[in-house]
Amino acid sequence: MTEKNINCEIEKKSLRKKMREAHASLDPIAKAFESAGLCMRFIQSETYKSSRAIFGFMPLKDEVDVLPILRAAIVDGKKVLLPKIVYEIKSNCKAEIFEGEKNSTGEIEGGKMDFYFVKRDPIEETEEGAHGIFEPKSSCEKADIENFFMEMRGEKIVVLVPGLAFTKEGFRLGRGGGYYDRFLERLSGICEAGENANNSKTKPKFVGVCYAAQILENVPRETHDIKMDIVLSTHN
């Protein structure tokens, strides 16, 4: 890691702390109204109406409650997918993949997000997993992302992306785990590898979702950070 990258990581860590502290001071009732307004605005947008599939997330307490979007998408017959974190650990020099909480026999080396189809109310189809995040139950069907994008070629797909902060231009500050960075990079690679990679209709639209207080002029970023196509916020 270069000195420039080290400095960027230090800046990100400091800003994450500030954003968490700032969010803790926000009024819960005001947040609920803002969440509801954002969801209604998105559901009425052409981006939502023209989409055939939505990659969503189960919100943490400091994230916009996107459940109304997910429920509307299910009712409207769209494909809805939610993530489950899969950790990779190194134990006795042997890599192992497991789901759930950190394994005490080794340290987490990295991880990824797998996505699962949700066909009913997300509250019914999820359960609390690692870090208090609600994830799809084992009864949900796991998506083969590569095949899914092959089958959906030519259709419009939306990926809702949470974050601690965004810029109006679409740059994002995540929580530091890198799960969305890796997933978005993976999706970008899948689309670039496809025979219709130059057709914008085959590429998913990355939509950052946040409160107005989470919009900043700048966030520390590195070359691998992927820009959002849209930032959904009452700020814009």
PLM regions: where:
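A residue-level signal for conserved active-site and pocket-lining positions in enzyme catalytic cores
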Residues: 19, 56, 80, 160, ...
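N-terminal active-site beta-alpha-beta segment that forms phosphate/nucleotide-binding
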Residues: 2-151, 155
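N-terminal hydrophobic or amphipathic segments with adjacent small-residue motifs
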Residues: 50, 164, 168-172
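Short secondary-structure boundary segments
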Residues: 58, 84-85, 163-164, 211-213, ...
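Short Gly/Thr/Asp-enriched flexible loops that form oxyanion-binding sites at enzyme active sites
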Residues: 65-71, 170-185
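Short, charged low-complexity linear motifs
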Residues: 38-40, 158, 162-166
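Glycine-rich nucleotide phosphate-binding loop and flanking beta-alpha elements
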Residues: 62, 88, 166-167, 179-181, ...
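Surface-exposed, charge/polar-rich loops and edge strands
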Residues: 2-10, 14, 21-24, 128, ...
